[in-house]
């Protein structure tokens, strides 16, 4: 090998080493860059993961805090409610104790008054005994005076004088007792009734026997009548209601005395008008649907009335009968509204007297329950109501209340008396009831006839829409004290022979005129 070849070999080695070093350096730097980038990516990802984890932990902590706060607030609210309920119960107990205390005080006052009354009666009896002894003495003297008369003449004279004196004493006694009873009872009764009326509000009513259905146009009248009147005949036959189609624009009148059948006809007709298909088969289908809808409506009405009054445990069939009262009127007054009003009034009066409020409301709501079916079953609404409540196992107090609220039988409980009183208040309220002109005129004529049939009556006049009768008497036949007796007798006869809402005032007028002429 020559020197040149060695030099070339050395140069080649050096160059190869340099190239290898350069290549290796580049590769190493690239690997470092890759490693650096990878490390930075891992660090960045770790930071993001740490940040995400941190946010999740913060959110979890906030949620836990909110949940804990909600639980604490709920628990605090429950405790507040419990404390409030306890306070309400304590307050209610205090009110109950106050009410019982007032009741006891009233009863003590009543007992004191009764004791005073008994003492007065004893004094009166003693006075009457003294009067009787004096009368015997007078009669003995009278017998001695009339000894010269015949036996028959003496007997007639004594009987006449005794009769006149007894009539006078009877008139005085009636007047005294009437004044005493009014003075003691009216004050307490008015207070109770005023409190009850203040807590009761009701609408004025009017009786109706027709319903009006609006039509989209007058062409619908022809479709309702149908070919040769078959549609209207079918509807009238199925519902028992008369359809009156006249010149009234866009309206059909439904006439009938049964409000339930009239309402069924109205619902069915409105459905037919809305559907547009009016023919006998469709009419039958809609009437059947209306009946089912009406039954459900009656049931819901009864349940709502029972719920509003806070009553429980009433038989479902009885609740349905309560709902039927919404479609029954008495002197133009809706019987369901009247029954609810009576129930509320009876409840208020019962609370004032310390009686069972719930039982009073129950008796008040059911007192006219017989009117729900009195047009379907024979008998008065009182008899029917007693049968229904007995059948559905109502309380004996409720049954007696129904039987006695018109005075047919004796009231056996205070609640029965309260319901009868509430019934009178509801019926006598101005605007509560109306009556037909024929019944009104007949009642006025009967009222005047009762007064005119009494001896010594010159003329009588029914005024104030029949709520007062003024009786003018002959002064030479009726004395002032006899006028008191006459007013009492007329009042009793009116109570026995007439049916009327509220009360009737009897006024007897005795006028004496003395006329002379100066010459």
UniProtKB/Swiss-Prot annotation:
Gene Ontology MF, one: RNA endonuclease activity
EC id: 3.1.-.-
HD domain location: 335-428
GO terms for biological process, alphabetical: mRNA catabolic process
Location in the cell: Cell membrane
Gene3D superfamilies: Hypothetical protein af1432, K Homology domain, type 1
InterPro entries assigned: HD/PDEase_dom (IPR003607), HD_domain (IPR006674), HDIG_dom (IPR006675), KH_dom (IPR004087), KH_dom_type_1 (IPR004088), KH_dom_type_1_sf (IPR036612), Ribonuclease_Y (IPR017705), RNase_Y_N (IPR022711)
SMART domains, per database record: HDc (SM00471), KH (SM00322)
Enzyme class: hydrolase
GO cellular component terms listed in the entry, alphabetical order: plasma membrane
PROSITE patterns linked: HD, KH_TYPE_1
Transmembrane segments: 3-23
Main location: membrane
Membrane topology term: Single-pass membrane protein
UniProt keyword terms in alphabetical order: Cell membrane, Endonuclease, Hydrolase, Membrane, Nuclease, RNA-binding, Transmembrane, Transmembrane helix
KH domain location: 209-272
NCBIfam families to which the protein is assigned, alphabetical: HDIG, RNase_Y
Family, per entry: Belongs to the RNase Y family.
Described function: Endoribonuclease that initiates mRNA decay.
Stated name of the protein: Ribonuclease Y
Organism: Lactiplantibacillus plantarum (strain ATCC BAA-793 / NCIMB 8826 / WCFS1)
Species lineage: Bacteria, Bacillati, Bacillota, Bacilli, Lactobacillales
The encoding gene: rny
């Amino acid at each position: 090998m020559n020197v040149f070849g060695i030099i070339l070999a050395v140069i080649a080695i050096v160059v190869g080493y340099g190239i290898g070093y350069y290549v290796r350096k580049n590769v190493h730097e690239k690997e470092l860059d890759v490693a650096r980038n990878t490390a930075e990516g891992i660090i960045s990802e770790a930071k993001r993961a740490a940040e995400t984890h941190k946010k999740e932990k913060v959110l979890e902590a906030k949620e836990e805090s909110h949940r804990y706060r909600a639980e604490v607030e709920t628990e605090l609210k429950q405790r507040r409610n419990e404390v409030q309920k306890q306070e309400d119960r304590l307050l209610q107990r205090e009110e109950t104790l106050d009410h019982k205390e007032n009741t006891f005080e009233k009863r003590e006052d009543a007992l004191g008054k009764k004791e005073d009354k008994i003492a007065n009666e004893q004094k009166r009896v003693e006075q009457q005994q003294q009067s009787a002894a004096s009368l015997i003495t007078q009669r003995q003297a009278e017998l001695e005076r009339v000894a010269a008369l015949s036996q028959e003449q003496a007997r007639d004279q004594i009987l006449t004088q005794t009769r006149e004196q007894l009539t006078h004493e009877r008139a005085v006694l009636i007047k005294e007792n009437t004044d005493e009873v009014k003075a003691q009872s009216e004050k307490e009764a008015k207070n109770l009734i005023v409190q009850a009326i203040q807590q009761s509000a009701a609408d004025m009513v009017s009786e109706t026997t027709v319903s009006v259905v609006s039509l989209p146009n007058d062409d619908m009248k022809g479709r309702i009548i149908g070919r040769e009147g078959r549609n209207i005949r079918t509807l009238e036959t199925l519902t028992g209601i008369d359809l009156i189609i006249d010149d009234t624009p866009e309206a059909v009148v439904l006439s009938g005395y049964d409000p339930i059948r009239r309402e069924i006809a109205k619902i069915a007709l409105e459905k037919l008008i809305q559907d547009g298909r009016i023919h006998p088969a469709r009419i039958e289908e809609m009437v059947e649907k209306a009946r089912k809808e009406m039954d459900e409506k009656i049931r819901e009405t009864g349940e709502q009335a029972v719920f509003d009054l806070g009553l429980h445990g009433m038989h479902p069939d009885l609740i349905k009968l309560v709902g039927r009262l919404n479609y029954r009127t008495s002197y133009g007054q809706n019987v369901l509204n009247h029954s609810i009003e009576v129930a509320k009034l009876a409840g208020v009066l019962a609370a004032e007297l310390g009686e069972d409020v719930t039982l009073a409301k129950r008796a008040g709501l059911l007192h006219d329950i017989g009117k729900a079916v009195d047009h379907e079953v024979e008998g008065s609404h009182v008899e029917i109501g007693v049968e229904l409540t007995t059948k559905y196992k109502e309380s004996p107090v409720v049954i007696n209340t129904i039987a006695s609220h018109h005075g047919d039988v004796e009231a056996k409980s205070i609640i029965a008396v309260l319901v009868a009183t509430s019934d009178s208040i509801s019926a006598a309220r101005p605007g509560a009831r109306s009556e037909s002109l024929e019944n009104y005129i007949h009642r006025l004529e009967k009222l005047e006839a009762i007064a005119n049939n009494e001896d010594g009556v010159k003329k009588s006049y029914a005024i104030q829409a029949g709520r007062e009768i003024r009786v003018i008497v002959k002064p030479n036949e009726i004395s002032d004290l006899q006028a008191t007796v006459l007013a009492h007798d007329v009042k009793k006869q009116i109570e026995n022979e007439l049916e009327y809402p509220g009360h009737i005032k009897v006024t007897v007028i005795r006028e004496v005129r003395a006329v002379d002429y100066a010459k």
